[in-house]
Amino acid sequence: MKVYKFGGASVKDAAGVRNLLDIVTGEQELFIIVSAMGKTTNALEAVFTAMQQGDEATALQRIDESYAYHRTIIDELMGADRTIEDIDKLFEQLRNIVRNTIYRSSDAELWYDTIVAYGELISTTIISNYLNGHGVANRWIDMRRAFLTEQRHKDANVNLEATEIRLKREIADSNVSVFVGQGFIGGAPDGTTTTLGREGSDYSAAIVANVLGAESMSVWKDVDGILNADPKIFPDARKIERLNYMDTIEMAYSGAQIIHPKTIKPLQQKNIPLYVRPFGNKHASGSVITGDVERAYEPIMIQKSNQVLLKLHSRDLSFVLEEKFAKVFNTLESHRIKTNIVHNSAVNLYMSVDSSWHIDDAILELEAEGFDVEKSEDVEMVTIRYYNDELYQRYAAFDERIIIKQVTPHSLRFVRHK
């Protein structure tokens, strides 16, 4: 079994879906994971926002706009007279959620997951139908039934043992060897829909690869492979042919967009190679991530923009006590806020954290626990792994925008004003 994952940018239009068909034609023993098409997740987030605000008319309008977008793709692929009943049913389900739900803020994340999951349900239904009509017999899999997650919304973890049983049951006794399933989504023990975190389709594919013992996983992207930097920011960026699991985890943790941070562990557990391959050229080698690659590449430079800087001041001047640190980290963890860099003095603590819905709630709690908190949102984090003196001098030695700097033998990391 191989696992292929296709992102939303790759299947944003009919041409992309045709290219997917070209890539998978002739493959056997293949599990295909697909994201929502194009910017559909953003569109469905707009539906959710309108629902939060009690604006039913706008929510329904956004659904109709999404339907028109997907209908255009279907028309180009299959003809204007082709009806896919399951697509119409999915959109009608969305409309009924908006019309019939009594929204409560305490259920915000539940309804967020329920609504945005339709992006993947719709994309995979279109693609499964198209493949079946063009010589690639396949079975559509509802990953809400196949993936058992914890009872947590927006960033759920997957129960591997239970998921292995469920997924194998879903594909058992099939007369086909190709399967199409959704990335990003799963199901909680109570049957509600969960999501695995933004851009979580990579993680979904890695879970499938793990529980099915796949020989490899391939992520098809609109890049030549893994680059050592974002070429939009660092013009001298070059492709890395081979990378090990550990450095990939470091890159993902630091904000590299190439792979979702949770993706590597399920692959590493079973030593499954991960290929990052160019969607526009199926014959190109791309990059490969395995467990047996020695470091033999250039410095890796990553810029992460969705950062918030928190400056905490202890009112009783006792910040050095471990109890104070514990309070801060426990509060942030309870709100699922990821901390990236921490720097402390005797009574002040500086923290760079990922932007989150819950930051203001966490700040209120921290203030109640005896801290004065200042928040800055105009910051970014830069990481240079395997830096050298020339890079240190160029980026970190004299930049007055830098607020926090961390230097280790292998990594240079700093937070600066944009």
Feature-to-residue mapping (PLM):
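A conserved active-site cap/scaffold subdomain adjacent to cofactor or substrate pockets
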Residues: R242-T290, R295-Y297, S305-Q307
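Nucleotide/pyrophosphate-binding catalytic subdomain
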Residues: M1-A256, I264, Y387, H417
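A conserved regulatory-domain signal marking ACT and ACT-like small-molecule sensing domains
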Residues: S285-K418
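Conserved dinucleotide-binding and phosphotransfer motif residues
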Residues: H134, K270, H335
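Short, glycine-/Ser/Thr-/acidic-enriched flexible segments
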Residues: G8-A9, M37-G38, I185-G186, S201, ...
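Residue-level "edge-of-site" marker
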Residues: R144, D222-V223, G280, S345, ...
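Electropositive, surface-exposed helix/loop patches at the edges of structured domains
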Residues: I171-A188, M251-Y275, K311-F325, K375-A396
